[in-house]
Design a protein with these regions (language model features):
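Short internal beta-strands
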Residues: 32-36, 222-229, 265-270
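Extreme N-terminal starter segment of soluble prokaryotic enzymes
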Residues: 2-6
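Short, flexible loop segments at boundaries between secondary-structure elements
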Residues: 38-39, 219-236, 291-294
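Electropositive, gly/pro-rich neighborhoods at or near active sites that engage anionic ligands
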Residues: 36-171
Length: 309
């Protein structure tokens, strides 16, 4: 069987940037994206899927690349009006973005799965890649803090990831099952790429689903991860803080340990070349290049490097 597609496990801004580069290097229809749903939440009675939307908007070239989320040229008049009635406004729902959440909630209400809903909606906005939720079952990332347990969006957006983190759990992951489409995508892939996403809250919820992790262990494809860290700091977001809270070394070596049971290669930044020896002893190959993606051209170069491994 000829393996022609590339599978990317994705969540967050780093993944969105990388995918913008990947589709410049390979045909977009040959890209399958398995996306985190641990960030999903409910706001104003609407089903919100932040990572799925960021990936879809990026591939459709509609993402606000300055903020890193939402639609470009967005307005917030509905949000401003909702505040008048006392509705929570800490999660900034844009006017056109609101249509996405309304449509998704309606399709789910009609009985479509999340996978079916995402397929319909991504096609409608011109995305040629296959975007797959990691599961159709509810999996939610929970952050335990001294003040109580928070949903990820409460921790990340409302609290601006300031509280101390005691633990991270994935509610529903033990019962969740990946769709056949996700499992086949991983098993039959030409190459599996772990995007430079937060290993705890973007990739972690997917790996907590047992059959996803099993598929990664069993696939005949090479599995390559791109580090979301340079040195001991995250390129963006709370990855370093969350890794430390979960007992991982805050370094590319710590990222490799998150994926140690299925990873073949990890891509480190040139500034971390000296760390290669601390990873290679674990039989994981180390590749070195510039992993920062300030623009689409840099993302293209990184994608070209990764698929050439």
């Amino acid at each position: 069987m000829t393996r022609t597609h590339y599978t990317v496990l994705a969540g967050g801004t780093g993944a969105a940037k990388f995918l913008r580069g990947l589709v410049q290097v390979v045909p977009e229809e040959d890209v399958h994206v398995v996306v985190n749903v641990g960030d999903d939440t409910e706001i104003w009675g609407l089903h919100i899927s932040p990572d799925i939307d960021s990936i879809a908007y990026a591939l459709a070239k509609r993402l606000d690349t300055v903020r890193g989320w939402g639609l470009e040229n967005e307005t917030f008049r509905c949000l401003e009006e909702a505040q008048t009635y006392g509705l929570p406004s800490w999660f900034r729902l844009g006017d056109r973005d609101l249509a996405t959440h309304l449509a998704r909630t309606e399709f789910l209400r009609r009985g479509l799965t999340l996978t079916g809903t995402v397929a319909h909606m991504t096609k409608a906005i011109g995305v040629k890649a296959r975007v797959l939720p990691a599961t159709d079952d509810p999996v939610r990332t929970k952050i335990e803090t001294p003040g109580g347990v928070l949903d990820f969006q409460e921790f990340f957006v409302r609290e601006r990831w300031q509280p101390q983190v005691r633990s991270v759990t994935y509610a529903g992951a033990n019962e969740a099952r990946a769709s056949a489409a996700v499992l086949n995508s991983i098993r039959e892939s030409k190459l599996v790429i772990i995007a430079p996403s937060n290993p705890i809250t973007s990739i972690g919820p997917m790996l907590a689903i047992q059959d996803v992790r099993d598929a990664l262990r069993c696939t005949r494809a090479e599995v390559v991860a791109i580090s979301p860290l340079i040195g001991h700091a995250a390129i963006s977001g709370p990855a370093a803080k969350l890794m430390e809270a979960c007992g991982y070394e805050v370094s590319p070596a710590g990222v490799a340990r998150c994926y140690h049971d299925f990873l073949d290669n990890i891509v480190l930044d040139t500034r971390d070349a000296a760390l290669a020896g601390s990873i290679r002893y674990e039989t994981i190959g180390v590749q070195i290049t510039d992993i920062l993606m300030p623009d689409d051209e840099a993302a293209r170069r990184l994608a070209e490097f990764v698929i050439g491994i």
